[in-house]
UniProtKB/Swiss-Prot annotation:
Entry keyword rRNA processing: no
Keyword list, A-Z: Nitrogen fixation
Protein name: Nitrogenase-stabilizing/protective protein NifW
Keyword field contains Oxidoreductase: no
Entry superkingdom: Bacteria
InterPro entries according to UniProt: NifW
Gene this chain is encoded by: nifW
């Protein structure tokens, strides 16, 4: 089986790290697993991996995974805004203060 086929069958983030022999901290992966895999996919998009030999696929995929993982060791997923729902989210301006004296029974 070709490496690209193996990668296509993986379902857990940990499996990608194991197959590509990339060390990781489980605490980082627990918080940012989907963001890391999404960013890896973005880095590989536009590359026809199926046309490449296994060695090239391994090198490209490993490099993309390492770069994506490194990004999320430095930044929080909410700040990276990888997913559309986070891209369009707005930070709240501040909390409104409602004094207790203004509340009625």
């Amino acid at each position: 089986m070709r490496l690209i086929d193996t990668l296509m069958r993986l379902s857990a983030a940990e499996e990608f790290f194991e197959v590509l022999a990339v060390p990781y901290d489980p605490a980082v992966l627990r918080v940012a697993r989907l963001h890391i895999l999404r960013r890896m996919g973005e880095r590989l998009s536009g590359t026809d991996l199926a046309a490449l030999p296994d060695g090239a696929v391994r090198a490209l995929a490993r490099s993309a995974l390492e770069a994506a993982y490194a990004e999320f060791t430095r930044t929080r997923p909410i700040d990276a805004r990888v997913f559309q729902v986070l891209k369009t989210a707005r930070h709240p301006r501040g909390r409104s203060f409602v004094p207790l004296s203004s509340l009625r029974r």
